[in-house]
């Protein structure tokens, strides 16, 4: 939990999920302060759009202007809602939209936290291009190290003339004026053939490893079990390649695709529809914070390639939460399978949570682990 006085409000903010007290990470950064410093309240006219507001620092500060918070993270939405409540601000003061929704027309101010991937930034800038005007004030911010020549060129290409500020507290801003430059259309998804399957995998802008199969998933797919039945989960599904493989290998099973990214869940749905349409009735698609709110003792197996970062920050909090949720939602003797980088030492974490852990396969970079839910039903 951290305190910030940004000139608009004095706020107490926390990350979601919360980090431990030993290795605390802040819920805001200098770029948030720097962005807010640029705004004279008298100049805010028309809708306020805030893109990629990780934990609500900008949305909370500008809540009286009824901003729209736009992004591709359900965790960020939950974190923003939690911080609104914690600071006594009505949740209804902020309207939440995912990045693929239609944006409000003629915004007065657009504040952008530059996302980690250029693909998501381009998708968002193209969406903004449809609604901004020459009078819209467009400001983006990030750590100085995360703003590159390619970032500036993208703003120029999609929206118009772009300048940058000096660094302040290691943060930097981008100012952009819309001039409606000529721009060729771009497809909504990036597609590629998945080797040895005949499948075409479709990826929205913010999907992990959208340009090809990541090496961890490739290794995982080589060791997925067969002949499972009941309900099984692709947790943190991304584009759904693990779930697709599970559907193909386990014709008696139902697969639940879960991710906190709406773009990921939509990519998974699209990939089942186009590659295994006959299996679509055996699928469920869920935008969620891991398995929050899912009833206990529901699943026979959970499969997970857990992230070890949240936006630009390195953290194992999300993976830790996924493992705990998996244990709660597995049936007795249900199994959790994960693939992870060897250096993350998830073996001992799983053993602490489940009381057991076995190594299924390993190579020079990755390890596949299995933990079994034991004990009596509680």
Swiss-Prot record:
Biological role: Specifically methylates the guanine in position 1835 (m2G1835) of 23S rRNA.
Reactions it catalyzes: guanosine(1835) in 23S rRNA + S-adenosyl-L-methionine = N(2)-methylguanosine(1835) in 23S rRNA + S-adenosyl-L-homocysteine + H(+)
Record's subcellular location: Cytoplasm
InterPro entries cross-referenced by the UniProt entry: DNA_methylase_N6_adenine_CS, rRNA_m2G-MeTrfase_RlmG, RsmC/RlmG, SAM-dependent_MTases_sf, Small_mtfrase_dom
Keyword rRNA-binding tagged: no
One Pfam family named in its UniProt record: MTS
Name of this chain's protein: Ribosomal RNA large subunit methyltransferase G
Keyword annotations of the record: Cytoplasm, Methyltransferase, rRNA processing, S-adenosyl-L-methionine, Transferase
HAMAP family per the UniProt record, alphabetical: 23SrRNA_methyltr_G
Keyword Cytoplasm: yes
MF (Gene Ontology): 23S rRNA (guanine(1835)-N(2))-methyltransferase activity; nucleic acid binding
Class of the enzyme per the UniProt entry, highest EC level: transferase
Predominant place of localization: cytoplasm
Organism: Salmonella agona (strain SL483)
GO CC terms in record: cytoplasm
Gene3D superfamilies on file: Vaccinia Virus protein VP39 (3.40.50.150)
EC number: 2.1.1.174
Coiled coil: none
Sequence similarity: Belongs to the methyltransferase superfamily. RlmG family.
